[in-house]
């Protein structure tokens, strides 16, 4: 089977879960350089798209190779112009993709990809399928909920996720992955967090928020509307079809993901591969194949060298 496009999650798939920084700075939470180079090379041959719970502001700086960004679990999907490669100085957390747990915070590298200076004129189109009145109403509720959680749970961080125009708060992530004993925190404290969220939802809104929990991952996501990776996958494929209208052949899609919220996308893909980037996590994935994070770049390079014709052999002896 020849792969026509690659759709991928970001957090935990292209960048290890343990490396995602809460400062949201441009130098943090980057794809390891070796893997990033390979993905850039692939994007010159076939479409590469990101399907993520992260927002546009976070993803745009880190995934300039992407043709389409489906952000905040599909709440907003953007089609982008192709960025040009440019070498600039940046700080990278990782020397390479050999071991996701070996941080090298002080490592300096002279390569960064796809520097964008067009002040977001790279956006060809943006699509938000949900009712904007509901999004606006629940934006205020999400902001209030984030503040209340921050006051009552001092040792967690809150990531606010905005639409690309920064006008609507469409989701929040309640994150405690930075805690040394986060597994204990998940067992003992996460249930209290869930109770607070549900009380807030029941007492404050005519439009119910959507809560995404995980069996082993150290965070909770709350969104302004119901959303999932299946809908995000469908939105991405629909946008791709518009750009390939002259080709009536059905495209074959490879999907990469790492958590339970990727399962709906796994089911839609022709080839689905789960990526394991943290040994402490044991999510229940419905993918066809599993690879370790430090094997991903090897597999993708093999796929490229094989002219994007997928076979099981590409996953042997990684």
PLM feature spans:
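A short acidic/small-residue loop/turn micro-motif
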Residues: 21-24
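Short His-Asn-centered micro-motif
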Residues: 8, 51-54, 256-258
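Mg2+-dependent phosphoryl-transfer enzymes with acidic/Ser/Thr/Gly-rich catalytic loops
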Residues: 223-318
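Asp-based phosphoryl-transfer active-site loop
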Residues: 4-19, 266
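Short, well-ordered alpha-helix to beta-strand connector turns
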Residues: 3, 45-46, 66, 73, ...
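Active-site phosphate-binding/coordination module
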Residues: 17, 29-97, 106-160
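Conserved acidic, metal-coordinating active-site core of Asp-based
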Residues: 144-254, 260-268
